[in-house]
Amino acid sequence: MKASRFFVSTLKEAPADAEVASHRLMMRAGMIKKLGTGIYTYMPMGLRVIRKVEAIVREEMNRAGAVELTMPVVQPAEFWQETGRFDKMGPELLRIKDRHDRDFVVQPTSEEVVTDIARQEIRSYKQLPKNFYQIQTKFRDERRPRFGLMRGREFIMKDAYSFDRDLDAAKASYQAMADAYRRIFDRFGLRYRAVAADSGAIGGDLSEEFQVIAATGEDAIVYCPGSDYAANMEKAEALAPAGPRPAAAKALEKTPTPGKSTCADVAELLGVPLSTTVKSLVLATDILDEAGNPKGSQVWLLLLRGDHDMNEIKVGKVPGLDKGFRFATLAEIDDHFGCKPGYLGPLNLKKPVRLVADREVMVMADWITGANEVDFHMTGVNWGRDLPEPELVADLRNVVAGDASPDGKGVLAIERGIEVGHVFVLGTKYSKDMNATYLDEAGKPQFLEMGCYGIGITRLPAAAIEQNHDERGIIWPDALAPFTVVVCPIGMDRSPEVKVAAEALYEQLLAAGVDVLLDDRGERPGAMFADWELIGVPHRVVISDRGLKEGQLEYQHRRDTAATKVPAAGIAEFIAGKFAQ
């Protein structure tokens, strides 16, 4: 491709609403253009990157035995009503009506449609396993679209769906997809981690997220430097502390803490470590009548160490809270504690509550908690002496750096990541809702076991940029670059020798199958170099009259600070060697 025929459009300044590097650089490099909130046009330069992502994903999906199809972007609501998602999903699901007042949705995923295909087409165990995938536009009406392609409303996604005869076979399909994902992200040349993720009601280790490592990532990735353990924050287990609980050493006292309503403020006032305080979180579960209407509520008190944060996914696995919970209302809090939030605790309750303590709190002695009286806290609190042992003990918190690794091979560290892929065993949720069955060897109908596997096609380039950029612009890995090599002739419009040499090298690289661009726009060297450094083409060759007289060209990788002189006759072989590195 020649630059004069292509569309190169760069900006000196990023739009004011671009908050992260990928958004700023993709806009400045002319890769995307904002059309509306969370909606972007993929400009020619950006589309080339997206097509390269799609090509690698498609190759590896086909290699893994998945079969490509394309499902409609606009789908009849009746399928979504079968599974209940039409009503259960919030405003993220875009619902529309046609001229006949029939309901439709704009797909965010396609479980319903692919399950409908399976129930019509898969009759026998002999047809299994099957794995269908598509690379298709999706729409999710995000409340706060931001960060460009990282969290847009319209996006391109690869979504795959496997169908198997039983859970063991589904696990095999899952593993094949997880292996394919590792090959995909290895080929992209990105630093990533595959981390265990929460698998919901299915249980087991049947869910993994693929996270590109980036300081600006929204997700916390927990890992052990001394082993292969990695999980997302929702999944990472906080082990029970080793050793017995210390003996009580302090008397129980009611201590004035005027105006100090947070654990941090109380610890500072009393001159004690934050880890000696205990925070009280009040939840509620609704009690329903036979018709399913709320007729009352059960109030719960969760106790966590003051320097720890509650993990809602873990809390949702506590017996009694696993059917759904909410934060208690102020009226419920006052009814049970007789006090406003900020001074709550497990002592001196007006009405009984169900008490759940985090594992860490169970081994604490002489701790500090609210006195259920404004401007007062209780100090020197001890289990057994001052209050009964809790009804339930569970892992309720997010892990922190330095916690023991669940695999026993060291301590945990935490880094940031951007989720670009997810593999997950669905089980029979959708097949039961939509009656998707097959006949086994005995001729008996069985529900299909399903898995789903997603990759954010348009999110991935943004994640790659967050990991690979500098003050000059993007630094693409070879596999993702819009062009792999750019030939930059200086004074091509004035020097026949430079023009001939540039055209010859361009044709030579094209013939060798290199994705090369010749910049024949006649730009000044500084402007030309700045454009390609911003756009992030990884390999640059500069041709000049002076260099030709010396029999040399200048090569520079995008990560290099200086150019390397290379004999003109061997430049193609030199570049090929760089590809192999």
From Swiss-Prot:
Enzyme class: ligase
EC assignment: 6.1.1.15
UniProt keyword annotations, A-Z: Aminoacyl-tRNA synthetase, ATP-binding, Cytoplasm, Ligase, Nucleotide-binding, Protein biosynthesis
Coiled coil: none
Molecular function, one GO term: ATP binding
Record GO biological process: prolyl-tRNA aminoacylation
Main location: cytoplasm
A Gene Ontology term for the protein's cellular component: cytosol
InterPro entries in the record: aa-tRNA-synt_IIb, aa-tRNA-synth_II, aa-tRNA-synth_II/BPL/LPL, Anticodon-bd, Anticodon-bd_dom_sf, Pro-tRNA-ligase_IIa, Pro-tRNA-synth_IIa_bac-type, Pro-tRNA-Synthase_IIa_type1
Reaction(s) catalysed by this chain's protein: tRNA(Pro) + L-proline + ATP = L-prolyl-tRNA(Pro) + AMP + diphosphate
Alphabetical list of PANTHER family matching this protein: MITOCHONDRIAL RIBOSOME PROTEIN L39/PROLYL-TRNA LIGASE FAMILY MEMBER, PROLINE--TRNA LIGASE
NCBIfam families found in the cross-reference section: PRK09194.1, proS_fam_II
Its job: Catalyzes the attachment of proline to tRNA(Pro) in a two-step reaction: proline is first activated by ATP to form Pro-AMP and then transferred to the acceptor end of tRNA(Pro). As ProRS can inadvertently accommodate and process non-cognate amino acids such as alanine and cysteine, to avoid such errors it has two additional distinct editing activities against alanine. One activity is designated as 'pretransfer' editing and involves the tRNA(Pro)-independent hydrolysis of activated Ala-AMP.
Record text about domains: Consists of three domains: the N-terminal catalytic domain, the editing domain and the C-terminal anticodon-binding domain.
Family (UniProt): Belongs to the class-II aminoacyl-tRNA synthetase family. ProS type 1 subfamily.
Protein name: Proline--tRNA ligase
